[in-house]
Swiss-Prot record:
This is Chromosomal replication initiator protein DnaA. It comes from Neisseria meningitidis serogroup A / serotype 4A (strain DSM 15465 / Z2491). GO terms for molecular function: ATP binding; ATP hydrolysis activity; DNA replication origin binding; lipid binding. Its main location: cytoplasm. Domain I is involved in oligomerization and binding regulators, domain II is flexibile and of varying length in different bacteria, domain III forms the AAA+ region, while domain IV binds dsDNA. PANTHER family: CHROMOSOMAL REPLICATION INITIATOR PROTEIN DNAA (PTHR30050:SF2). The gene is dnaA. One of its GO terms (cellular component) is cytoplasm. It holds the Pfam family Bac_DnaA_C. Residues 72-180 are annotated as: Domain II. Residues 181-397 are annotated as: Domain III, AAA+ region. The keyword NAD does not apply.
Length: 518
């Protein structure tokens, strides 16, 4: 098989394997070539090549071994080669249909199937596709096809007509926002997908296409700033795009509480009930704030039953699992778990970089890869802080009339954050955090035990100390019970390799970074 035959098929396979954002950002722009009989994948610079080798080389090699096993492994280098079109579906060798449980990056789907609904209220099979059907299809076919269709030729229009059309669109958007409280910026097109939100995004799109069916309610939980509001509002915007006549409302739980109390105070309770029962989709953010308010919880219990019985979609967000909401009515905690409950996790490095690049593109600013990597490594905890950091750097770029964000500009704009992170973190803090995380004693981390359950956390702690402090290798060794600097170096290298090969350890490392820095 020649390179010209292989690469279009490889693109198709990678397109089917990877989330759309990853494929579009890293794989689709690649060019390839042949040098001295060796197949070469060209990246635009060394940073891109390093990212390709660490994140995608294994997948590319797996496809090569299957389709062109006689060829040697690919080489990755900066340069420019030939750009090939992706093979059509019928031209590619169809991969085996993956299980919903396959792959370490996907959450176990048995947690979200229909049998979670209580036995006393079984779900009747629908004649049309349910959200469960759509979600299953999406999980089999992730990543999704690009949502924006290619532009087609059209007749030119006058400036006046174009302005009138734009004004009408803006007025319609403003009117829709007033009626629904949805932000037009929160759509699936503006959402960046990664490991932390991939299943939730697929489920949200399925619900937008078939609301009120299997996954009702859709309960999304996670720490602040992870993108819960964006994702749930995207469902509302997508539903209105498909069904402009749908009645949709987004609100914070505080607004619901105030609305209910006003109805009680003004004796307009019946009007209040009818107002909420009219919606086809009701989205309530931070539902945990109704806890401890007995009358509000009682009223919401009846509203919940109405939505469930009428197969109208209810979407709720929270900071914890339903069962962990202290002070919440037990009946509500039980019902919150009837449908689909998913967690949003902090964005991984690749997703953070993609978010920064998308923000830069939207702002009309160019950001160098090294600068994006620097900011993404500096801000790890949540999307909101990451976007805030970018806004600061972007403002500096505009004020200094520098159209390209490089690493020096990023360092200057974020110097107070850099100083704060390095000021408070010590080796002792890291050792304490790692010991608590792995449930071992600090004396074990500092001691001589070499069993796997002790040695691995010790190496993780050494690696974190190297990354989060300014200590030299000998100083790190001193902090870990007087170990030699070569032992520290070996531990750091071992962890770096394991983070590429072991998804569980990589996730542990990311969680520890966030815990220690926050």
């Amino acid at each position: 098989m020649t390179l010209a035959e292989f690469w279009p098929l490889c693109l198709r396979r990678l397109h089917d394997m990877l989330p759309h954002g990853q494929f579009a950002q890293w794989i689709a722009p690649l060019t390839v070539g042949e040098e001295g009989g060796v197949w070469v994948v060209y990246g635009k610079n060394q940073f891109a090549c390093n990212m390709l080798k660490s994140q995608f080389a294994g997948k590319i090699e797996a496809v090569r071994e299957e389709l062109a096993a006689g060829r040697s492994a690919f080489v990755f280098k900066p340069g420019e080669g030939v750009c090939y079109e992706m093979a059509a579906v019928e031209g590619a060798v169809e991969p085996a249909e993956p299980s919903l449980h396959a792959g370490s990056e996907e959450m176990p789907v048995q947690e979200v199937l229909l049998d979670e609904l209580p036995s006393e209220e079984p779900v009747k099979p629908a004649a049309s596709k349910t959200a469960a059907d759509i979600l299953a299809e999406r999980m089999r076919n992730l990543p999704h096809e690009p949502r924006q269709a290619a532009g087609s030729a059209s007749r030119p229009e006058s400036a006046a007509v174009a302005k009138a059309r734009t004004d009408a669109q803006r007025d319609a958007e403003e009117a829709r926002y007033e009626q629904t409280n949805l932000s037009p910026d929160y759509t699936f097109d503006t959402l960046v997908e990664g490991k932390g939100n991939r299943l939730a995004a697929a489920a949200a799109q399925a619900i937008a296409e078939s609301p009120g069916q299997s996954y009702n309610p859709f309960f999304l939980y996670g720490s602040t700033g992870l993108g819960k509001t964006h994702l749930v509002q995207a469902v509302g915007n997508e539903l209105l795009k498909n069904r402009p006549d749908a009645k949709v409302r987004y609100m914070h739980s505080d607004d619901y509480i105030r609305s209910f109390m006003k109805a009680v105070r003004n004796n307009t309770y019946d009007v209040f009930k009818q107002q909420y029962k009219q919606y086809d989709l009701l989205i309530i953010d931070d539902i945990q704030f109704i806890k401890g308010k007995d009358r509000t919880m009682e009223e919401f219990f009846y509203l919940y039953n109405h939505f469930h019985n009428e197969k109208k979609q209810l979407i709720l967000t929270c900071d914890v699992l339903p069962a962990k909401i202290e002070g919440m009515d037990d009946r509500l905690k039980s019902r919150f778990s009837w449908g689909l409950t998913l967690e949003l996790e902090p964005p991984e490095l690749e997703m953070r970089i993609a978010i920064l690049q998308k923000k830069a593109e939207a702002a009309g600013i160019s950001i160098e890869d090294e600068a994006a990597l620097f900011i993404a490594n500096l801000i790890r905890s949540n999307v909101r802080e990451l976007e805030g950091a970018f806004n600061r750097v972007g403002a500096s770029s505009r004020f200094m009339n520098r159209p390209v964000i490089d690493i020096d500009l990023a360092r200057t704009a974020l110097q107070d954050i850099i100083a704060e992170k390095h000021k408070v973190i010590t080796a002792d803090i890291i050792i304490d955090a790692v010991a608590k995380y792995y449930r071992i004693k600090i004396s074990d981390v500092l001691g001589k035990k070499r069993t796997r359950n002790i040695a691995r956390p010790r190496q993780v702690a050494m690696s974190l100390t190297k990354e989060l402090t300014t200590l030299s290798l000998p100083s790190i060794g001193d902090s870990f019970g007087g170990r030699d600097h070569t032992t520290v170096m070996h531990g750091i290298r071992a962890v770096a390799k394991l983070r590429e090969e072991d998804p569980e350890l990589a996730q542990d490392y990311e969680k520890l970074l966030i815990l220690i820095q926050n």
